[in-house]
């Protein structure tokens, strides 16, 4: 006890020193100044105010359930969302080690605290009113250093109340502690508070120690909040950045021997991983936002409080209690959030009149008893060490700690959050409140990822866990589809509402990469669109406040758009399952955002229960991930051109069906020096997006020496700039590895070729890993079920580098597109300026597979001796005889009396007329007879008899 009292005395002396410095700046005089720690308040069990509320649900996931954190959240949402919060108890085997307990951290690392005045959380006077009072009942009121909570720094001390306009009730900065010291101080506090017969400085007998139960602590806590008779001050280590202090979960250390901690470091329930798991849209936020994506640590003591609040952007939150005493939570269902806010304003009118955003400050409590009286449902959860608490979107929650403990929390955003997040940012705009992240960036990132997964699924029919998750939120009724459609409708309405005075420009790809772009008036995020003017090119407005930006003439004002409305509606159709739209946006994912599609990011699909090591990427996959990350920045600059480019419509067939066309014509952005075609509103007050055009101000330099050398090497590989020579040389090098087997169904042939199942060939071509060298590619035909044949091209030495499509031509287009990306990485100039790459544009996929090579054709045709694939053989007959068969109802030239070609001799003209009258089947049979290919002996005998009769006839 002496040791605890000594520690408390040193803490109080430090606190007193800080308060004395505040006193000198304050206009109010304290009644007394303590020279020793005084915890004068005592437990009063007879006046306990424990609220009568129902308990929130508790869930006990099985090991299988625990494998997929987001899947489990999705599973329990329907059962728990109506409570606002729930408790999750992990399987018994899941017990991650806590690095915070290591001696170097536990005894040596210090963290800052805040002083909380528990008796003032609900019952206090407004700041302005309290500063006018000359005499205070409580000595400390004059010493409160008013603070403002910031997500970035946690606690930012203001000017100690010297200015009424600046002072806001909050948490005063307290002393720094180590975890060991804080635990001892909490023990001292509880011994003093709950054992009134002992003086704080005397020894307490072990048999007299009393450990209050949770219900005792809860009753006393709300007595202090509702009807305090004494001053109760505690400390709270809140909002501690884990990047600085350290996380309570182990982190993976590459290069070190694998241990038990490493298994937990890669677990999905490790809060360092949770926010960016596959399926959480926060995965598309590239910045490590402290408190949202990077967890915060919370070190509590008895009665330390987290006041009523809702998560930023109405996100889900997950809290894990690493060690220590329980934490009592209270939750309100999200659909009662507005009712809760109204009750708070009704019961605390003076505080809200002075500070309308009071609920954003996390400094005010209101008893669950009062809330229930007003008809607001409240639920309780008691979290113990090793357990999780999940809060749902827009669910207000609060609580207090029963003693010393360490907890960690982070946000997560499954797809069902998107509708809540959209409502949040629209509300922030009306309140003119800054946001923590870009909702539109997350929405578009999720939509593009889902589209790419749909594209992969349409080709391979393989449902990986990631693809299956995105597939579930698509279709017309899918959660993601609905969220994107709603946002596109909003964007269209806002564009159409701007009736005059604005031209449209294409937004730069990196418009908001290096700095946040927000509306000058309401702070709305401007990732999707922004309004500006030549008079203030670095000042922007949202579409709602576009007309409030300035009063300049219409010719000087413009709107920047990241995607046209046609493109956005195509994205909606893609999510609904339209194959053409899927193809278009999958191409955009590959070409425009190569660092964002799944193949580049290569998820580590995290497991647990207990944590299973995540699947590692091969060296090739890791190299591809790193390379594409570097290429993406270069790609953004390459896709611009120094000439004006007309943006193609979504409906254009060449854009829909060929990714390379959208790559050539896409423009990432402009600045104020760009030439812009003004686009006025058309009939009905709508923008005519067909007229949007832009001109880049950054023409690329072609002076790079390394690029020149690369061009020479590429020329050498392709056989020079002669396109025909290059492709001819490549076609001759096709090696047939397997002819496969015939499939007599639609789609398994075309007019140009037969596609045997299991067909496999080898060809040399520029390497997608190193374009300066040739490598072997394996081309094969697989069975994709109802889709028919699936064409796949893979690098022979690195099979994980593969490209698949339902079209042989497009399959090789994907290879050439990848080649362009690799060349961009090595060459600092546009692909369009590399004339040596022109042969890439003429590469024929059928030829690269070998389907146009004579030796391959002969082998493949032998698989169909009966000519069952009529589409192919009919076209072949036409080519052989040089005449189209006469369609039913048509007449040939001779019947019409048309003149015959005089250059042909009489016999040829007669033969051509005869052949035109034949059906395709008859032509094929005749060809077989004349060439000796038919095996039908009866037909051969009939033909011989016919010839004999013709010779006998006069």
UniProtKB/Swiss-Prot annotation:
One Pfam match: FYRC
Consequence when changing residue 312 to A: Decreased demethylation activity
GO MF annotation terms: DNA-binding transcription factor activity; histone H3K4 demethylase activity; histone H3K4me/H3K4me2/H3K4me3 demethylase activity; histone methyltransferase activity; transcription cis-regulatory region binding; zinc ion binding
KO phenotype (gene knockout): Early flowering (especially in long day conditions), but normal development of all organs. Partially redundant with ELF6. Increased H3K4 methylation on specific genes, thus leading to their derepression. Slightly increased levels of CCA1 and LHY circadian oscillators transcription factors as well as of other clock genes such as TOC1, PRR5, PRR7, PRR9, GI, ELF3, ELF4, and LUX associated with higher H3K4me3 levels near their promoters. Impaired systemic RDR6-dependent post-transcriptional transgene silencing (PTGS) associated with reduced production of aberrant RNAs (e.g.
EC number: 1.14.11.67
UniProt domain JmjC: residue ranges: 263-429
Inducers of expression: Circadian-regulation with peak levels occurring at night and lower levels after dawn under both diurnal and constant light conditions in a CCA1- and LHY-dependent manner.
Chain spans, region Disordered: 1-46, 148-170, 641-670, 884-905
Family (UniProt): Belongs to the JARID1 histone demethylase family.
Name of the protein this chain belongs to: Lysine-specific demethylase JMJ14
Species, as recorded: Arabidopsis thaliana
Gene transcribed to yield this protein: JMJ14
């Amino acid at each position: 006890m002496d040791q605890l009292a000594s520690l408390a005395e040193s803490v109080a002396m430090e606190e007193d020193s800080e308060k004395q410095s505040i006193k000198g700046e304050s206009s109010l005089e304290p009644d007394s100044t303590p020279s020793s720690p005084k915890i004068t308040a005592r437990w009063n069990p007879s006046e306990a105010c424990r609220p009568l509320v129902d308990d929130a649900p508790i869930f006990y996931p099985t090991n299988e359930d625990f494998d997929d954190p987001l899947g489990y959240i999705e599973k329990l949402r329907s059962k728990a969302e109506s409570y606002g919060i729930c408790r999750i108890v992990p399987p018994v085997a899941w017990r991650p080690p806590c690095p915070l307990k290591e001696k170097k951290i536990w005894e040596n690392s210090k963290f800052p605290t805040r002083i909380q005045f528990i008796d003032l959380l609900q019952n206090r006077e407004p700041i302005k009113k309290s500063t006018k009072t000359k005499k205070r009942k409580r000595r400390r009121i004059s010493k409160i250093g008013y603070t403002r909570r910031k997500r970035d720094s946690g606690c930012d001390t203001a000017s100690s109340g010297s200015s009424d306009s600046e002072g806001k009730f909050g948490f005063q900065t307290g002393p720094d502690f180590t975890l060991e010291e804080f635990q001892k101080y909490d023990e001292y506090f509880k011994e003093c508070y709950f054992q009134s017969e002992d003086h704080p400085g005397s020894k307490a007998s072990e048999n007299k120690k009393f450990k209050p139960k949770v219900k005792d602590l809860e009753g006393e806590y709300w007595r202090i909040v509702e009807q305090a008779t004494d001053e109760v001050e505690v400390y709270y280590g809140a909002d501690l950045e884990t990047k600085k202090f350290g996380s309570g979960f182990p982190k993976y250390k590459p290069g070190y021997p694998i241990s038990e901690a490493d298994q937990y470091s890669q677990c999905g329930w490790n809060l360092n991983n949770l926010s960016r798991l596959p399926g959480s849209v926060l995965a598309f936020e590239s910045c490590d936002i402290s408190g949202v994506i990077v967890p915060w640590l919370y070190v509590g003591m008895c009665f330390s409080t987290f006041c009523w609040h809702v998560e930023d952007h109405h996100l889900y939150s997950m809290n894990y209690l690493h060690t220590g005493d329980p934490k009592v939570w209270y939750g309100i269902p999200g659909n009662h959030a507005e009712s809760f806010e109204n009750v708070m304003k009704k019961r605390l009118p003076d505080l809200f009149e002075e500070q309308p955003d009071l609920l954003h400050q996390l400094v005010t409590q209101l008893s669950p008893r009062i809330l229930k009286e007003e008809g607001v449902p409240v639920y309780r959860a008691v979290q113990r060490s090793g357990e999780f608490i999940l809060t749902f979107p827009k669910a207000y929650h609060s609580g207090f700690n029963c003693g010393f403990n360490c907890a960690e929390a982070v946000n997560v955003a499954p797809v069902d959050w998107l509708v809540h997040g959209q409502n949040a940012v629209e509300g922030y705009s009306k309140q003119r409140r800054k946001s923590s992240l870009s909702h539109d960036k997350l929405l578009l990132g999720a939509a593009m990822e889902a589209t790419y997964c749909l594209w992969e699924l349409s080709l391979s029919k393989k449902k990986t866990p990631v693809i299956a998750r995105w597939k579930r939120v698509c279709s017309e009724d899918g959660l993601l589809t609905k969220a994107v459609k709603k946002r596109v409708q909003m964007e269209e309405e806002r564009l159409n509402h701007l009736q005059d005075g604005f031209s449209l420009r294409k937004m730069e790809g990196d418009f908001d990469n290096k700095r946040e772009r927000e509306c000058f008036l309401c702070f709305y995020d401007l990732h999707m669109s922004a309004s500006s003017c030549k008079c203030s090119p670095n000042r922007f407005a949202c579409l709602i406040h576009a007309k409030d930006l300035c009063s300049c003439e219409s010719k000087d004002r413009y709107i920047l758009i990241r995607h046209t409305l046609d493109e956005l509606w195509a994205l909606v159709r893609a999510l609904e399952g339209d194959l053409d739209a899927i193809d278009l946006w999958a191409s955009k994912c590959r070409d425009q955002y190569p660092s964002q599609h799944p193949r580049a990011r290569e998820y580590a699909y995290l497991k647990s229960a207990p944590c299973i090591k995540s699947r590692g990427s091969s060296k090739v996959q890791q190299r591809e991930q790193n390379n594409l990350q570097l290429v993406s920045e270069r790609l953004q600059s390459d896709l611009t051109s120094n000439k004006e480019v007309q943006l193609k419509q979504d409906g254009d067939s060449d854009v829909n069906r060929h990714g390379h066309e959208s790559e050539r014509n896409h423009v990432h952005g402009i600045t104020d020096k760009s030439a812009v075609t003004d686009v006025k509103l058309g009939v009905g007050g709508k923008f005519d997006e067909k007229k949007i055009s832009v001109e880049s101000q950054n023409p690329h330099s072609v002076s790079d020496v390394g690029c020149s050398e690369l061009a020479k090497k590429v020329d050498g590989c392709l056989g020079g700039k002669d396109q025909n020579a290059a492709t001819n040389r490549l076609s001759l090098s096709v090696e047939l590895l397997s002819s496969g087997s015939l499939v007599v169904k639609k789609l398994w042939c075309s007019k140009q070729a037969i596609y045997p199942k299991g067909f496999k060939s080898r060809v040399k071509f520029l390497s997608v890993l190193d374009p300066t060298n040739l490598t072997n590619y394996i081309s094969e035909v697989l069975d994709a079920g109802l889709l028919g044949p699936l064409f796949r091209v893979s690098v022979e030495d690195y099979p994980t580098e593969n490209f698949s499509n339902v079209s042989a031509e497009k399959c090789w287009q994907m290879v050439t597109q990848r080649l362009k990306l690799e060349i961009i990485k090595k060459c600092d100039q546009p692909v369009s300026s590399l004339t040596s790459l022109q042969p890439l544009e003429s590469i024929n996929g059928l030829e690269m597979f070998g389907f146009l090579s004579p030796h391959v054709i002969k082998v493949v045709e032998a698989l169909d001796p009966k000519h069952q694939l009529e589409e192919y053989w009919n076209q072949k007959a036409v080519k052989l005889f040089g005449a189209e068969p006469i369609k039913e109802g048509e007449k040939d030239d001779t019947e019409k009396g048309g003149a015959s070609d005089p250059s042909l001799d009489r016999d040829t003209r007669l033969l051509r007329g005869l052949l035109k009258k034949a059906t395709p089947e008859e032509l094929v049979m005749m060809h077989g007879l004349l060439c000796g290919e038919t095996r039908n002996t009866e037909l051969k005998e009939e033909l011989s008899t016919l010839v004999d009769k013709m010779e006998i006839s006069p």
